[in-house]
Every structure is written in C-alpha cells, then in structure tokens.
Amino acid sequence: MPIVDSGSVAPLSAAEKTKIRSAWAPVYSNYETTGVDILVKFFTSTPAAQEFFPKFKGLTTADQLKKSADVRWHAERIINAVNDAVVSMDDTEKMSMKLGDLSGKHAKSFQVDPQYFKVLAAVIADTVAAGDAGFEKLMSMICILLRSAY
C-alpha cells in the first residue's frame, strides 16, 4: 500500500496494530540513533526539504547532519511524534488532536511544504517495516492528519 496524504484510510486491524507495535518497539528503544539516521536519510535524499530548517543551513554532508545537536533534537521530536501515534492507535481521537496541533504549527508557524510529510513518512516506513502495509497505513494516517491545517 503506498503512503497517501489525502482522503482517508481504513482503520487499522488488531493484527496490524500488533505487528506495528512489534516492529516499532526495537526502533523506539534506540530512538536517538534511529531518529537521526531517518532524518539524515530524508535530507540526503531530499535536500530541498532542508530549506525549512534554518538551523540546518550549511550542513551539507551526512556526517555534518549526524553531528548536529539541532538535527538530533529535531530527530527526537519526530520519533516521539510517531511514537505518540503508535501509542494512540486505539484512541484515534487523541491521535487526531495531537497531530492536528502539530499540523497547525507546521502550517502556520514554520510554513513547511506539506509534500514533505509523505516523503519523510516513506523513509520512516522503509526504516521501520519496509513493505509492511499496516505500518504504511499508519504513516498514511499520520500524513493525512499532518496536512489537516493546510
């Protein structure tokens, strides 16, 4: 299932939730390293996205990105937001509220181009559970909610 950022997706089944939690647990237990790896992969594969992060200006190599405290801080925030979604899979209202707030910040305060949510979600999905339709469905849910303020 390709990741989408508009429309709607079917609710996650109990089996999909179980599989997502199993795939996510080892990732989140090492969230600092994994988060940085995900963000570095995102920026090296999509350098135009870096323009929305003024603190990352001048960081042009993967090594520079990995060593940046600002990159590490933002990577942690991203991983924690995904973790919040994983934890909230049984409470979609809570997930909608948290990600809706995050959408508003990205749309109004940071003016991030929403096309990059789907690109980053694909990097996360590939890192966590490559090819798993349930995890891709969760990433789609996140992307749709992150676009809600646009």
Curated annotation (Swiss-Prot):
Positions annotated to bind heme b: 74, 106
Subunit structure, as described in the record: Monomer.
The family this protein is said to belong to: Belongs to the globin family.
Keyword Transport (UniProt): yes
Domain Globin: 11-150
MF-aspect GO terms: heme binding; iron ion binding; oxidoreductase activity; oxygen binding; oxygen carrier activity
PANTHER family: CYTOGLOBIN, CYTOGLOBIN-1-RELATED
Protein name listed in UniProt: Globin-3
Superkingdom per UniProt: Eukaryota
InterPro entries: Globin, Globin-like_sf, Globin/Proto, Globin_lamprey/hagfish
Protein keywords: Heme, Iron, Metal-binding, Oxygen transport, Transport
Any further remark recorded for this protein: This is one of the minor globin component of Sea lamprey.
